[in-house]
Amino acid sequence: MITELHGIDIRENEPLKHYTYTKVGGPADFLAFPRNHYELSRIVAYANKENMPWLVLGNASNLIVRDGGIRGFVIMFDKLNAVHLNGYTLEAEAGANLIETTKIAKFHSLTGFEFACGIPGSIGGAVFMNAGAYGGEISHIFLSAKVLTSSGEIKTISARDMAFGYRHSAIQETGDIVISAKFALKPGNYDTISQEMNRLNHLRQLKQPLEFPSCGSVFKRPPGHFAGQLIMEANLKGHRIGGVEVSEKHAGFMINVADGTAKDYEDLIAYVIETVENHSGVRLEPEVRIIGENL
């Protein structure tokens, strides 16, 4: 128990595999669940004062945490998940579930968020990665975000300053952490929005191995190619290392089929990169983030 942070939900030596989509990850020294910005500021101020590292994990949907875990503080925004509407502007805290947020937009007959209706993760992670699917991406509707700097300052970043690119945003370099974001939506027809979301979710269910733990799409799309196609052409569908294998359903996904570890994921990613490059001459670049310490 850290007496200076009394009243905040903090768990010591907590295995992170219970909180990641891959179901892998070693322990965090301290796993914190702030309920508001004040508690978040207290955690960051304490960590900075004690020279302890800290990071925000988000919903960990496109992330692999190594088996040795993470030192210092890991902060999760599960309790910072409010969503508000002001006219056609939707504002969501970073911990808000992305899929649930798209449902709120649909309920109010607001269009623009349909592309994200099946993307797992949080609002904060979606902004960080400029998440996208089926021709849409966060940058198309993004207005601004409140972020927490490494020094503990809260500031607002505009769409221009976010410098979005393919699965990229400026905060990947600055280290700023999204705590809330605003999006510009448009009035639409509820039935039309609902039908489009149903169509996209049906496509996702047909093509993606949603029944297994995974980190989503593992690799960025190489120019002029599709990662899944290159992996399939290299005869890697079903290839397995430890408990992790390349999905038979979609070669761009790696699934945890038998108590796999983060090392299994890393070894399989490295093997796929090398094999695909030898086969096609194209070097795949991971989209998934890998953090933490090895055992």
UniProtKB/Swiss-Prot annotation:
Pathway in which this enzyme or protein is active: Cell wall biogenesis; peptidoglycan biosynthesis
| Active-site residues from the entry | 167, 217, 287
**Its GO CC terms?**
cytosol
Looking at the UniProt entry, the stretches that span the membrane are none
Domain of life (superkingdom): Bacteria
* Keywords recorded for this protein, A-Z: Cell cycle, Cell division, Cell shape, Cell wall biogenesis/degradation, Cytoplasm, FAD, Flavoprotein, NADP, Oxidoreductase, Peptidoglycan synthesis
Per the annotation, which location comes first and is thus the protein's main one?
A: cytoplasm
Pfam families named in the record: FAD_binding_4, MurB_C
Q: Name one GO biological process term.
A: cell division
Protein function = Cell wall formation.
Q: What is this protein called?
A: UDP-N-acetylenolpyruvoylglucosamine reductase
